[in-house]
Amino acid sequence: MPKTYPEELAEWVKGREAKKPRQDKHVVAFLAVKSDVQAALDAGYAMKTIWEHMKETGRLRCRYETFTQHVKRYIKAAPVASPPPPATPPDSQPKGAKPEPKAAPPASESKSEPPKIGGFTFDATPKKEDLL
């Protein structure tokens, strides 16, 4: 007995979903080789060279544009861990003493205006000496 149209459609949809690429598979693949990419960039290799090698060896299957976006997002824009500020011991002053106020920076008494930007200014009324 032939299949009904809904059954045929259901099979087609299942087959189509299996073929549809997931957008995050390239992110997962990039994150797997992120440390290698970082090491190669630190060694001075160009991103294009790194991508070409990883594409030829099968480590990445994404386009170069996608690769550069992932490098920008996950390597270059990654927050760099900054060292914490040096901690001062809390018992450095006696408990009864008031902390000394910090001296305010000396204020300049004469505030100078920023220099005007030079350039072309248009005057709609011509000068007679310019016309002759």
From Swiss-Prot:
For this UniProt record, the keywords arranged alphabetically read as follows:
Plasmid
Biased-composition ranges, Pro residues, are 81-92
Q: Is the keyword Cytoplasm assigned to this protein? A: no
Region Disordered, annotated ranges: 76-132
Enumerate the InterPro entries for this protein.
Answer: DUF5338
Top-rank lineage group of the source organism: Bacteria
Q: Does the keyword Methyltransferase apply?
A: no
Taking the record's annotation, the residue ranges forming a coiled coil are none
**Identification of the protein by name:** Protein TraK
Natural source organism: Escherichia coli
